[in-house]
Amino acid sequence: LNIISADGTENKVSDKRAANTEDENSSSENSKEAYDAAIYGDADINLSGNGKLTVEGGYEDGIHSKSNLSVESGNYSVTASHHGLNGKTTLVVKNGTFDVTTVEDALHSKGDVTVENGEININAGDDAVHADNTLNVKDGTINVAASNEGLEGITVNIEGGDITVNSSDDGVNAAGDTEDGSQASYAINISGGNLKVVPGGDGIDSNGDLNISGGNIFIDGPSDGGNAPVDYD
């Protein structure tokens, strides 16, 4: 599924269904709903163009691909009662401008999330950017005004970019469960970029390794005295 927002246009896709309040979201095998997002696809979804696309995910997600979700360019405003942009296998942001407001995660994948460039502004009720596997930030600007945890994955790689995270819990977190329940090798690797974290919990928290070889890091907190600016095993 290729969605191109033509230059100079303003487009809107809205899911008017009431928010799903059940514990299991509608993409589960037992769900009676065929789809759970304003824009939904069983196959890959590719977004591009220089126009504006507003997406309102009233029921659950704003945009959800059961395969790979990729954004090449464009201007996006996404609100959702669950996740904002959800690529089950992978989520890749190559470029674009985003304003994402969600009850759950703003950017989410059961696989890998990669941010190559772009400007992403996030207000999230849960994680700002969450990968069940690996989260890569290569460049771009990520501004997280509010989140539970900011950047989370089993492995978090920050190679560049300008990142500001406000979180009620951990700012950058290497944690989570593997799909088969086995013990994961957690790691946070920071080799470049500018990272500012204003956390309620730990600023940087790895349940495994922490490797810092470059970049600029500023941690203002935590506000909760039971936590630490940096915590790793």
Spans of model-derived segments:
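A composition-driven surface/loop motif
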Residues: L1-D233
